[in-house]
């Protein structure tokens, strides 16, 4: 469902084309399908539609497919990278966003095929090129995972 922004307000939805222009991840490791509710330098919501065709389900686990928890965390981190890239207008050709640390990570529910992960992420602190985030991965109204992490912007040239 696409939401229309009020007159005079920039749209807050980011489609897959823009996501791919902003972060270097590609299928099968691109774990964000779209973003919405973007508020520059503050927050964003990432969306991942988890299908039975995801390559990790072939081995995790064939008889009871579950999205690996580390990939749920990676999806949240990619969502934060989109937030940083769009907020800071980072040129992907000259900069990269690297995951630095992970704290208070909890897995609350399995993520199975057919789930739609809704990942609200917010900036909790920033200093120079280092940003701290807090986020959750939600399935409907249930928390599947939650964590806090840090990332930094680095020059690649």
What is each PLM-predicted segment?
Residues 1-31:
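N-terminal leader/capping segments at the start of a protein or of a new domain
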Residues 1-11, 40-41, 111-115, 122-157:
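HotDog/MaoC-like acyl-thioester-processing domains
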Residues 4-13, 80-118, 144, 152:
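Hydrophobic beta-strand-centered segment that forms part of the acyl-chain substrate-binding groove
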Residues 20, 63, 106-109:
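Beta-strand-rich interaction surfaces with strong enrichment in secreted/lumenal proteins
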Residues 24-67, 72:
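Catalytic strand-loop segment that frames the active site of acyl-thioester-processing enzymes
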Residues 29-31, 117, 131:
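Hydrophobic core residues within well-ordered beta-strands of beta-rich domains
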Residues 33-36, 103, 108, 120-124, ...:
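Conserved positions in beta-strands of structured domains
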Residues 35, 67-91:
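Active-site helix/loop of acyl-thioester processing domains in fatty-acid/polyketide metabolism
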């Amino acid at each position: 469902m696409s939401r229309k922004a009020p007159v005079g307000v920039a749209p807050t939805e980011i489609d897959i084309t823009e996501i791919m222009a902003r972060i270097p991840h590609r299928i099968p490791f691109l774990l964000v399908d779209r973003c919405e509710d973007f508020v520059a330098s503050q927050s964003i919501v990432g969306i991942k539609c988890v299908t039975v065709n995801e390559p990790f389900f072939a081995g995790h686990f064939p008889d009871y497919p579950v999205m690996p928890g580390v990939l749920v965390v990676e999806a949240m981190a990619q969502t934060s990278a989109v937030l940083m890239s769009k907020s800071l207008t980072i040129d992907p050709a000259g900069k990269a966003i690297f995951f630095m640390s992970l704290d208070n990570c909890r897995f609350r529910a399995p993520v199975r095929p057919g789930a739609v992960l809704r990942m609200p992420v917010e900036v909790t602190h920033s200093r120079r090129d280092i940003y701290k985030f807090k986020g959750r991965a939600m399935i409907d109204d249930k928390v599947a995972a939650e964590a806090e992490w840090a990332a930094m912007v680095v020059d690649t040239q």
